Amino acid sequence: MRPSSPSKDHYTQVPIKVQHRAAKRKRIRRKRVDLNCGCSYYVHINCHNHGFTHRGTHHCSSGDEWRLYLGGTKSPLFQDHSTRQQTVRNEPGHNNRPDTVQPQPEESVGTTSMLDGFQGLDDLTASDLAFLEGI
């Protein structure tokens, strides 16, 4: 006969397949957002603090992020309407090149400057070279 009160001694765990089946039936909590360009996207309840860029426009899904991207008088952060100076100037030394590929130094042929100080490297025996390769 089964006890009337649940006890940890008499508890059987629900099989994982049953848990997965129940989780699949659960409705996905998400919100549909329509954009000005005619596109729409869905925001999952757990992803509400992430933004993205679509067709050159940054879209935000959180109130904190909207505060940073609001412009003009709507912005709670920038209520001062005076003329602002540019914070990052295009001066020599700043990386303001249009291409994002950074040039790599050319590989040189010969000994490196690190080995220039060692004299007598030609005098190493085969056992010395085997030891150094094993390190």
UniProtKB/Swiss-Prot annotation:
Annotated zinc fingers (unnamed), start-end: 37-54
Any one GO MF annotation of this record: structural molecule activity
Compositional bias per record (Polar residues), positions renumbered to this chain: 98-114
Region of interest (Disordered), residue spans: 77-115
Motif (Nuclear localization signal): 17-32
Pfam families: Gemini_AL2 (PF01440)
Keywords tagged on the record: Activator, DNA-binding, Host cytoplasm, Host nucleus, Host-virus interaction, Inhibition of host innate immune response by virus, Metal-binding, Phosphoprotein, Suppressor of RNA silencing, Viral immunoevasion, Zinc, Zinc-finger
Region listing for Transactivation, in residue ranges: 120-135
Entry note about domains: The zinc finger and the transactivation region are involved in PTGS suppression.
Name of the molecule in the record: Transcriptional activator protein
Organism this protein belongs to: Indian cassava mosaic virus
